[in-house]
């Protein structure tokens, strides 16, 4: 049986492109002989029934991912994971619009592929955003460059022995400004760059990608709003703040954290957020709960026993709160869900407002 991602909630069909970028002016921090080369999936509102179904993962990437996690052949084979049905279409025609769409950059967790945020990306695009998910080279289990070249993971061996994980979020805070230059600058690398409203840009990330969101905001004033989903702030927020820009902190259930994993970075960095801010936790959600993995795990009978919230419900909450946050702060659309607890979402606990 083929797995399938949840359908987007927005009004628009979704198109998807792949864009391989090379920064000729910056060497890769993990492979110094190579130029830095982010690989993007770009999602946008599209005309329905144009293009062809977009694949989820390349088989070599799926195999590398499952092998690294010790799940190869145990719960799912690479071909099944790669064949997961998405709700975006390659080669689709962009939806004509008199207005441009805000841009949102999504950065995945460490060792995770950009595909792990596909459910969120498709939903945001269906609501009227251009979304760029980013594979940061040599930081995931395998990045398949167009043409078939596989970039294997190199970063872990360099940051874990000496505890220098902040190098990852610091490096991504350099990746994203380059991506913005190539998407919104005078020499755009994307054929549909005209769709982007460069005056309204947001960034969200999972785990270390969430830490990269605040680090990028500190480095680049073009990013107007940010979201950290369950990520330790490895790169501290500057004491002077983020220029009064809004920031959402959305985390898993603290009761599910191992006792030997204290994380005070959210408390430590909260006072430095000097704009609109919220800190929320989701009861029953584990660390992967803000990605596609729990949804797909439920479908193959591999649900983590210590994370009782279903994958479907985890994604409903993630898409609702992240989407409403960007609607409010990039498009000026009221989002009462963010004002306080609601009976419709009893799992969501407001810790700070």
Where are these regions (language model features)?
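Primarily recognizes the serine-hydrolase "nucleophile elbow" in alpha/beta-hydrolase
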Residues: 179-243
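Active-site machinery of serine-nucleophile hydrolases
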Residues: 43-47, 57-64, 69, 115-158, ...
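Alpha/beta-hydrolase-fold serine-hydrolase catalytic core, especially in secreted/extracellular enzymes
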Residues: 3-6, 11, 24, 47, ...
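Domain-level recognition of soluble alpha/beta enzyme cores
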Residues: 1-104, 308-311, 322, 331
């Amino acid at each position: 049986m083929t797995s399938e991602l949840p359908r987007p909630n927005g009004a628009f069909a979704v198109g998807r492109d792949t864009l391989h970028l090379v920064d000729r002016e910056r060497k890769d921090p993990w492979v110094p002989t190579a130029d830095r080369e982010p690989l993007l999936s770009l999602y946008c509102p599209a005309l329905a029934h144009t293009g062809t179904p977009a694949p989820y993962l390349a088989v070599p990437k799926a195999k590398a991912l499952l092998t690294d996690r010790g799940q190869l052949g145990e719960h799912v084979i690479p071909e099944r994971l790669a064949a997961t049905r998405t709700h975006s279409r390659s080669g689709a025609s962009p939806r004509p619009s008199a207005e441009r769409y805000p841009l949102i950059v999504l950065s995945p967790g460490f060792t995770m592929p950009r595909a792990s945020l596909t459910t969120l990306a498709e939903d945001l695009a269906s609501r009227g955003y251009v979304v760029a998910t980013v594979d940061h080279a040599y930081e995931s289990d395998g990045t398949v460059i167009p043409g078939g070249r596989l970039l294997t993971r190199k970063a872990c061996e360099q940051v874990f022995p000496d505890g220098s994980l902040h190098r990852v979020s610091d490096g991504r805070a350099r990746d994203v400004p380059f991506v913005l230059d190539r998407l919104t600058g005078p020499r755009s690398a994307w054929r549909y760059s005209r769709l982007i409203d460069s005056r309204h840009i947001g960034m969200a990330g999972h785990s270390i990608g969430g830490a990269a969101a605040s680090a990028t905001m500190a480095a680049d004033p073009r990013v107007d709003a940010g979201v950290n989903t369950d990520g330790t702030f490895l790169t501290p927020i500057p004491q002077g703040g983020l220029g009064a820009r809004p920031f959402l902190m959305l985390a898993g259930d603290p009761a599910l954290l191992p006792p030997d994993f204290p994380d005070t970075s959210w408390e430590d960095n909260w006072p430095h957020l000097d704009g609109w801010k919220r800190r929320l936790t989701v009861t029953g959600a584990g660390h992967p709960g803000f990605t596609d993995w729990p949804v797909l795990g439920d479908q193959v009978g591999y649900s983590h026993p210590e994370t009782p919230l279903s994958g479907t419900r985890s994604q409903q909450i993630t898409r609702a709160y992240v989407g409403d946050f960007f609607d409010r702060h990039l498009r000026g659309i009221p989002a009462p869900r963010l004002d306080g607890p609601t009976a419709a979402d009893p799992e969501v606990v407001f810790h700070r407002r």
